């Protein structure tokens, strides 16, 4: 078994789009590790609203002020990605009890695939506990105000997606 570098944490997700909840989690994790790698997954099965490269750029823009945070897009098995960046800890956010069952199942599978890597769960600050990318996308799609949930650049990207869809109709 490989010994993983516990000083490198990997925070994987689709980040479609990155939200203030994601940013909060990374901001609180950054002081705990030498390096936090935010892995932006391609996730074609989820049918992302934003292309991978745009999600990577938006995440870099939102997290660039952290000197020890690196944002990387990936389209491989998470276990392979974690090993490729020499991660030793997987970071996952738990917003509510409803997240726990899925996250527990994923942590168990990851323990099987990459036993040298530990999963660490962090809970969001209370003001972010109800934010999810899927809710943000849906509210934005329907013309609602999501400015309190995402950075300005993400708000603009979602506005452009909505306008492009409206132009196609």
Curated annotation (Swiss-Prot):
MF-aspect GO terms: ATP binding; pantetheine-phosphate adenylyltransferase activity
Cofactor(s) the protein needs: Mg(2+)
One GO term of the biological process aspect: coenzyme A biosynthetic process
Involved pathway(s): Cofactor biosynthesis; coenzyme A biosynthesis; CoA from (R)-pantothenate: step 4/5
Main localization of the protein described in the UniProt heading: cytoplasm
Reaction catalyzed: (R)-4'-phosphopantetheine + ATP + H(+) = 3'-dephospho-CoA + diphosphate
Subcellular locations according to the entry: Cytoplasm
Site for Transition state stabilizer, residues: 22
Record keywords: ATP-binding, Coenzyme A biosynthesis, Cytoplasm, Magnesium, Nucleotide-binding, Nucleotidyltransferase, Transferase
One family name in Pfam for this protein: CTP_transf_like
Annotated positions binding ATP: 14-15, 22, 93-95, 103, 128-134
GO CC field: cytoplasm
Record-listed E.C. numbers: 2.7.7.3
Record function comment: Reversibly transfers an adenylyl group from ATP to 4'-phosphopantetheine, yielding dephospho-CoA (dPCoA) and pyrophosphate.
Quaternary structure (record): Homohexamer.
Similarity field: Belongs to the bacterial CoaD family.
PANTHER family: PHOSPHOPANTETHEINE ADENYLYLTRANSFERASE (PTHR21342:SF1)
Name this polypeptide is given: Phosphopantetheine adenylyltransferase
Source organism: Stenotrophomonas maltophilia (strain K279a)
Taxonomic lineage of the native organism: Bacteria, Pseudomonadati, Pseudomonadota, Gammaproteobacteria, Lysobacterales
